């Protein structure tokens, strides 16, 4: 009550922010007459002037009013477009490292030019991030004339660019690209073997367009660079044949109830689990088909891989539906459909064997599984930027998440013209058939009065179902979904013409405005070298049609189902009513819709259906509240999942930072001999300690064992017995020194044969490749650990704490193994001449580069942080564990502090 009263008196935080920014808008507007009087050359010279002032110590905030005024004036001259005051406010919000919520049609692309120009002045580069290649290329080409007029360079970052072109693109002042490509470039840079092969420079400032889609919808989907693993396509095919024999059980097993079904499905969390009966039945089938020994169990450590395959096949059959989650294209490939945009994602593959299981289910060629070489989530990639900002039409519903995870405040920017769209209440029918009949009637009415309609569906399957119903009703329409995305621009250009009917899966076509009356630009582009008269005639004709559409009520939005997230519903609505245009929207629902079926209580469902007759609709505030409550519930659960995922990924992220910093250090220096020398001392000392324990009696020494170990591991012939016989006063410390000195002498002899520089290059090459191999193994071990960690909850242990503890132990093993493996390789290598080492180094590099070339970028399946594990605790990461290892005292501490281990957590040991 008091909060509401205070808000009325002093305004909300958003109101106060807007008041503060409007004062700066006045300042920018005051520069307008002065800048209008400047010649083109004088206006262009402003960029050089601003850069000089920055060098003299002026801040970007101090330059902001003049810089924004410069961009606005340049835009007027280049495009004949003047930034509105609300766009200036949006630009300031972005410059402040915040999220600007701007409605569809308010000119987000033009708004982004303001902070992009200002933040490109220091010369560190600005990244403008979009959701797909088409938008990245379109926005770069649209804004290129403006930035080049002001003396700035513009680049585009899209997949499959040649390395040199990509490197040049990153040197541009302003770089447009997709979120995936920026993330993958970061991972690829951290797999490179030479500095000149890296493309990215520092991550200074990013403007993320459609920020909700990238930082929220895709937050659960890690980016993965993977390489080929072993072929197990036959196993997928054989297990795929068993799954159709399993029966679904509606209720979970409990102490009081044990069903006779084989698996249960949790639709809320999108999980499928084998029941006890199911496990026994699958084991029987496996034995019968020669996949398992009699009396063996699926959950024994030796059968981990079989359980993994069964789970993948079960998920493929039960949770993943053709034409909803994926399509099979003409080439017989399974292509993922993005659940948020309805677009296909060629080249992306689900991980953990799921893609292969779907291929087996569809009977197409099964491609090899991949092994993770590097991975990162968008959450952690975008937090690497010094300053991050974003734009979207719908962020307010997720403002809390942006603030708590990314530290980004959301500012709602007012529209340039008042919004007059009529958002009508939802109507609910008993069945889907009744709902579709009502939608067809609504569309008929709109077509008759010449009003364009955009119909949003949640899947390809539903869009085709509706399309067939419209064909029967003889209503002409266009379908925009993953199957027909090649015609996307053409369909969107026509979607605003009188009486047009467009069915769009989810938010396909997002990023392109639907212009009432159709797109006159598309008609102009269709002409070859159009004259001014032709362009004027097209514009005049368009104006007439535009006014006609406005009179008919503007664009009408029909939602065929409520999405789990209110934000996606708002995005669909936001396609209408742009820039103060007329428009309307309505959602048609049925009690068979998944959201209502899963999340509405049985009491509410029976209450609604009891008084309804066939074809009758219900409009109820209580029902609308119930639906919104269900959506909030789902949003809350999804937020918790993303937050938990981040907490787990933060553990890997701290370790990733240590590994990548070590890699950076190795890449930036030519001579790592000091590091090698220190590592050699640490490794040999650790081995000596095993056979000659510190401060022990001579009777406890295993001299023969030590001699054999030094020979086997390091090819070192140390005559320790002889030394002890020759000098009976040779004590433990002096002996240690003697062995270390001998190892150094032997190594120095190699250096004399091949030359110092050749050996330095070889050391660096061995160190980098060993680090990459161990990191790859470590990622696999972390995956296995993660999948089985939820089982610790049954032992009254905190899975998160256990995960942190065990992953730290794994990381200790990695750092110790790095030293041991590098010293072993360098010690055992035998050389006669310089050319041999050069040839070996070239061979190792060629192998590594071939592996990198064969690596592919992919998305993992969206993760649940505590999903049902496919591994038992014992089998989860056993093969990867290196026992009896410790972090080297001079290594970076795995906690990520940046200090040496001995000066940080090493003090505690």
Swiss-Prot record:
Its main location: membrane. One of its GO terms (biological process) is intracellular protein transmembrane transport. Residues 899-909 have a biased composition (Basic residues). GO terms for molecular function: ATP binding; metal ion binding; protein-exporting ATPase activity. Belongs to the SecA family. NCBIfam families: PRK12904.1, secA. This is Protein translocase subunit SecA.
